[in-house]
């Protein structure tokens, strides 16, 4: 039997992993959509190769680690570390379109979750965003939302990677 806490985590996980949840995840597909928009011929194996490379070289060592740290810092209410993490990941996204897509998706996710969850850290993050004091990076916002929803780091990691793969 699953505990009530496990069921709550799984329900929250499904809720923000739903493709109808309005976060604009497609904007974070790291250019995969442009392959299809430009009618480029690409095989299934090539798509798998692109996704594997991005998971190993970008998403895993940067965005995933940032998300896990943001979740951890939110759980211990270390807002200064959340802010620092947000600034660092933003500075690592050298391509303007990727950086802007991360911000748009991150803030949209935070705003949506904030509508149905009462969380002090998430509210503070959104206030700091309005004041221009943080960027709203998607990986940071995701970690804060996972914490606000009571989702474990392991389940949040699976959700985060799943979101990248299907976007």
Which sequence ranges carry the predicted segments?
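Inter-helical turn/loop segments and adjacent helix faces that build the functional surface
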Residues: 35-45, 116-124, 148-156
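A generic alpha-helix surface/boundary motif
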Residues: 26-30, 139-140, 167
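Internal, conserved structured core segments that host functional sites
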Residues: 64, 76-149
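Short, conserved micro-motifs enriched in small and acidic residues
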Residues: 18-26, 100, 136, 159
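Glycine/small-residue-rich interface belts in oligomeric ring/scaffold proteins
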Residues: 12-79
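Charged, compositionally biased N-terminal leader segments and the immediate start
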Residues: 2-13
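C-terminal auxiliary extensions adjacent to catalytic cores
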Residues: 40, 160-167
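A short glycine/serine-rich beta->alpha loop
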Residues: 13-22, 51-57, 91-98, 126-132, ...
């Amino acid at each position: 039997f699953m505990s009530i806490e496990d069921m709550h985590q799984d329900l929250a996980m499904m809720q923000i992993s739903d493709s109808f949840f309005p976060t604009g995840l497609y904007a974070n597909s790291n250019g995969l959509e442009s392959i299809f928009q430009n009618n480029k011929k690409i095989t299934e194996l090539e798509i798998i190769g692109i996704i594997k490379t991005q998971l190993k070289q970008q998403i895993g060592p940067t965005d995933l680690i940032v998300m896990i740290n943001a979740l951890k810092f939110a759980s211990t209410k270390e807002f200064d570390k959340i802010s620092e993490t947000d600034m660092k990941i933003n500075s690592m996204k050298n391509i303007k379109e990727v950086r802007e897509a991360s911000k748009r998706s991150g803030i949209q996710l935070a705003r949506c979750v904030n509508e149905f969850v009462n969380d002090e850290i998430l509210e503070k993050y959104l206030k700091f965003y309005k004041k221009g004091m943080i960027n709203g990076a998607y990986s940071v916002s995701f970690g804060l939302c996972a914490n606000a929803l009571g989702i474990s780091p392991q389940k949040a990691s699976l959700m985060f990677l799943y979101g990248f793969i299907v976007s």
